[in-house]
Amino acid sequence: METCQEKLKISNDEMKKIVETNKNPKKKLTQAMRIHLREKEFKNWCDLKSKGKGVETFKDCKEVNKRIMEKRGLTNTEWIQILKMNGQVAPVRALHGRGQDNRCRHCDEIETLGHVLGFCDRGYLLRNTRHNTVRTLIADEFRRLKWNVYEEVHCINPSRSTQRIDILIYKNKNDKSYILDPTIRFEAGGNQSEDVNIEKKAHYDSVIPYFKEKYKLADIEVIGLFIGARGTITVDFENFRTKFDLSKEMRNNIALSVIKSSVQILQHHTYNL
């Protein structure tokens, strides 16, 4: 065991901690050491300034990560592109060593992966398709559970201009109803999920009276749902899913559709496919 510890470069203090935190006495110590090394490397990855951007989001839903790493529903080409996106080594111009010009090949912004997947006009229609697919998956799941569901509902705000919400759901008009806004953004770390929820609540707050009046609803809550552009599912999304008893299949389909669409956006941007 000492030889193994030495070869793996595990310090005595680390080894002591591994032994103390090994909650399952039946688990082999070598397995506990592997877990420790994996978590250590993940932390090192998260600490990287560029390549670790948003990586901590991957730890929130390991089931989805496992499905992606097992290539479920993915072609070999898609899987390779996903690995490149996750490691921040996709062929975008802002990547160190790609060339002197880091400007986008379709606009004048710096061509980062986040720009390609979330902002560049080149992928506008594909991003809309990616979003609409997620919206429909969520709406159909609520329909399966016998909720009243409305998609792409137009409304008028207090300034008399038109707005549109993604999903309106309710079961009983006297109970709480919900405006749902799934939002796909590139994982950047921090409290993105909470920030999206706060942002959407503020954005739709002014139209709540309109929907109360039109649909005769007693109470409406706005929920902003953050989904990572690299197919990550957050703790907040999982809490939302379990609160409404939505299926894991829906969650898995959302993650798969998002990551496949992001691959398509990247390839369309870089290779005109």
Region locations from a protein language model:
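Short Cys/His-based metal-binding microdomains
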Residues: 98-139
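Catalytic cores of nucleic-acid endonucleases
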Residues: 162-165, 177, 182-273
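Active-site metal-binding core of divalent-cation-utilizing nuclease and nuclease-like domains
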Residues: 95-100, 137-184, 198, 226
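Alpha-helical interaction elements in eukaryotic regulators
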Residues: 11-14, 25, 29, 75-78, ...
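Short amphipathic alpha-helices and their capping/turn residues within compact interaction modules
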Residues: 109-112, 143, 147, 172, ...
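Mobile genetic element proteins and their domesticated derivatives, centered on retroelements
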Residues: 82, 104, 115, 120, ...
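Conserved, non-catalytic sequence blocks in retroelement Pol enzymes and Pol-derived host proteins
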Residues: 72-73, 94-97, 123-130, 189-196
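Extended C-terminal regions of large enzymes
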Residues: 1-93, 99, 267
